Amino acid sequence: MSSAHFNRGPAYGLSAEVKNKLAQKYDHQREQELREWIEGVTGRRIGNNFMDGLKDGIILCEFINKLQPGSVKKVNESTQNWHQLENIGNFIKAITKYGVKPHDIFEANDLFENTNHTQVQSTLLALASMAKTKGNKVNVGVKYAEKQERRFEPEKLREGRNIIGLQMGTNKFASQQGMTAYGTRRHLYDPKLGTDQPLDQATISLQMGTNKGASQAGMTAPGTKRQIFEPGLGMEHCDTLNVSLQMGSNKGASQRGMTVYGLPRQVYDPKYCLNPEYPELSEPTHNHHPHNYYNSA
C-alpha cells in the first residue's frame, strides 16, 4: 500500500465557492496561539504548515494524553493512510469524552483531505475552552460558564408565598361572559335600565343598539322615482305616467302636441289669423295686386 495521501481533484462551481468562503473564515492569529499552546504542552515542533503537521494525528493524540492521561491507548507512528486516519479518529473520541460538544468537533476528512481547516481550528478552540474549565492554564479560547447551583431551605422557599404579585386579589367576579366574537353586532340593551327591547332583529342599523322598531319598509332602489304624496294631507294624486324634471307634481302638464325633434314648427293660431280668400279663375289676373289676395281686415 502506498504511503501517499488520498488525492482529491480541484473544486469547481459551487463547491469552489463554498471552499473559498470557509477559507476566508480561517483566523491566522488564532492559529499562532494554538501552535504555541500545543507545542508548549507536547514539547514537539509542529512545522511550518500547521495543518500538515497535525494531519498524521500523532501530535493530536499526544496532546490529548497530556490533557487527560490515558485518553488514547495506542498511537500509530506508521505513515500509512489508515493508521493516520485511525489516530485522528481516536483523537475525536478522546475529546468527546473530555467534554467537547459533538457539534464543535470536526470530521476526519476535514483535516486529512484539507476540506475544512476552519472547522478543525474551531474544534481546537473549543478544546481550549473546555481545558480552562478543568483548571488548565490556557491563554486561548473563552472559558465556559460554570454551573452555579444553589440549595434553599424549605423555610426559605415558604417565604416566597408571602410575596404579593402584580395581579393578586379579586377581579370582583368579572368574566368574559356575554362577550361576542370580533366583528359581530353589539346590542346596547340592559333590562335593568327599563329601556325598550330592540324589535327589528333583521335590519342592521348604522348605530349599534336599538332602532326603536324602524325598518327599511317602503324604501325604493337607488335611482327610482320618489312620489311625494301623503294621503293624510288631503293632496291630489300626482301624474304617475309622465316623468317630470322636478320630483313631485307637474300640475297636469304633458307632452301632448309635441313634435319629433328636427321637424319644422308652424307658427299659426286661428284666433289671430283668418282664412285666406283666393280670386276666381275667370277674373283677369292683371286687375288684382298681390297684396289683395289676402284679406287683412
From Swiss-Prot:
Residues 28-131 form the Calponin-homology (CH) domain. It comes from the Eukaryota. One of its GO terms (cellular component) is cytoskeleton. Coiled coil: none annotated. GO terms for biological process: actomyosin structure organization; negative regulation of vascular associated smooth muscle cell proliferation. Calponin-like repeats lie at residues 164-189, 204-229, 243-268. The modification Phosphoserine is found at residue 175. Pfam families: Calponin (PF00402), CH (PF00307). Thin filament-associated protein that is implicated in the regulation and modulation of smooth muscle contraction. It is capable of binding to actin, calmodulin and tropomyosin. The interaction of calponin with actin inhibits the actomyosin Mg-ATPase activity. Part of cGMP kinase signaling complex at least composed of ACTA2/alpha-actin, CNN1/calponin H1, PLN/phospholamban, PRKG1 and ITPR1. This is Calponin-1.
